[in-house]
Design a protein with these regions (language model features):
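Conserved class I S-adenosyl-L-methionine
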Residues: 5-77, 91-95, 125, 181-203
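Conserved Class I S-adenosyl-L-methionine
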Residues: 19, 25-31, 89, 212-306
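Class I SAM-dependent methyltransferase SAM/SAH-binding core
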Residues: 83-85, 89-140
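Residues lining the SAM
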Residues: 107, 154-157, 183
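A short acidic, Gly/Pro-enriched loop at the edge of an enzyme's catalytic core
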Residues: 139-150
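A short SAM/SAH-binding and catalytic strip from SAM-dependent methyltransferases
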Residues: 150-162
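A short glycine-rich, Lys/Arg-flanked "PGG" loop and its adjoining helix->strand segment in the class I
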Residues: 164-176
Length: 306
């Protein structure tokens, strides 16, 4: 079920504004249209609303690699068949192969992200015998029950309308005894950039549409795994500050990583103008620190009783 009230950190005025807007979205039905929500996210990561996403790897790999390395360091991937849900440009998938995975399925809702992942895999010498690319919906995985030894999703959960369903799908496709590793956006994840963007953008075009980003607490993520039937669940939270030379650089990073999907309802001719205004706001307010808040959760699928 889609979430209505903002679950992360924001300044009080912005939290009140977002919650009021999301109530309106619920009343009009927009907040319950999960298909449209996922479509906006997919289009954002395919560059439909802005070309910022073309800088995804150049501007974001250094920061995203830190979370990916931390997520995989607890996993034994040697000889395992692995599914990477919401693989983006393949950062986790390629790390999994380096850690000895037998084969990785790199799955994402965006064909543009998959294109970049394919190119990176080819450049690193990984063929189709080791890595396969699939367009997938995290809430309805196109795989049979008990298909993988390990299922990983890195920092995708917060973009999904039905997070519980996504975790249930992860558990379903795991083999008995298999490991799940879920990376989730914590409450403070990118909050400075979110807050500044909400203040700066033209509100008339986003009025009545649910925001497509939903951070979670460590306790909430743990509960999602437990409710999906996973056992031996453990979590840890990592936070750090990403520093940028100036506010413009901070905005460029945020717009690329988040894909600027909030421009979905803007007239196309208004997007560049509003993006420039928002970037100027970041510079004027000296937004040069952006928090990474990462919840890492692990669980095991129980073995069949016999």
């Amino acid at each position: 079920m889609p979430i209505v009230f903002w679950t992360g950190k924001l300044s009080l005025p912005m939290k009140l504004m977002i919650n009021t807007n999301n109530i309106l979205a619920w009343l009009t039905g927009n907040a319950r249209d999960a298909i449209a929500m996922k479509q906006r996210i997919r289009q954002g990561y395919e560059g439909v609303f802005s070309d910022h996403v073309t800088g995804y790897d150049e501007l974001g790999t250094e920061f995203q690699m830190k979370a990916a390395i931390a997520q995989l360091e607890e996993l034994d991937l040697q000889g395992k068949e692995v599914l990477d849900v919401g693989c983006g440009t393949g950062i986790i998938s390629l790390l999994a192969l380096k850690k000895g995975a037998l084969k990785v399925i790199c799955g994402d809702i965006s064909e543009y992200m998959l294109k970049l992942a394919r190119e990176k895999a080819a450049n690193q010498g990984y063929g189709s015998d080791l890595i396969e690319f699939r367009n997938i919906d995290a809430e309805s995985l196109p795989f049979g029950d008990a298909s993988f030894d390990v299922v990983i999703t890195g920092m995708t959960l917060g973009l999904l309308p039905d997070q519980a369903k996504a975790v249930e799908e992860i558990a379903r496709v795991l083999r008995p005894g298999g490991q799940a590793a879920v990376g989730a956006h914590g409450p403070e994840h990118y909050w400075e950039a979110c807050d500044a963007s909400f203040r700066a953008i033209n509100k008339r075009y986003v009025l009545g549409y649910r925001l497509e980003f939903w951070p979670r607490t460590e306790k909430e993520v743990r509960l999602l795994l437990e409710q999906a039937g996973l056992v031996d669940v453990r979590t840890r939270r990592l936070t750090w500050q990403n520093s940028f030379e100036n506010g413009g650089n901070a905005y460029d990073f945020f717009a690329a990583i988040s894909s600027s999907w909030w421009y979905a309802k803007f007239p196309r001719e208004k997007i560049a103008e509003d993006s420039k205004k928002t970037r100027n706001y970041f510079e004027r307010k000296r937004i040069t620190q952006i928090t990474d808040d990462v919840i890492l959760a692990y669980g095991r699928k129980p073995r069949d009783l016999a």
